[in-house]
UniProtKB/Swiss-Prot annotation:
Keywords: Metal-binding, Ribonucleoprotein, Ribosomal protein, RNA-binding, rRNA-binding, Zinc. Part of the 30S ribosomal subunit. Contacts proteins S3 and S10. Its cofactor is Zn(2+). One of its GO terms (molecular function) is rRNA binding. This is Small ribosomal subunit protein uS14. The gene is rpsZ. One of its GO terms (cellular component) is small ribosomal subunit. It holds the Pfam family Ribosomal_S14. InterPro entries: Ribosomal_uS14, Ribosomal_uS14_bact, Ribosomal_uS14_CS, Ribosomal_uS14_sf.
Amino acid sequence: MAKKSMIAKQQRTPKFAVRAYTRCSVCGRPHSVYRDFGLCRVCLRKMANEGLLPGVRKASW
């Protein structure tokens, strides 16, 4: 879990647009965030396995 202070700091608009970055909407993780879902890879996998994301299924080839 990310610190509450870091989550609050990220929600403010930055002085320069380049400084903006994505964070997981569930756990607050700043790295490996999928923009389509707004989730990090860990939360995405967990929620997909639980069937909480409609239309997402495991790959099989």
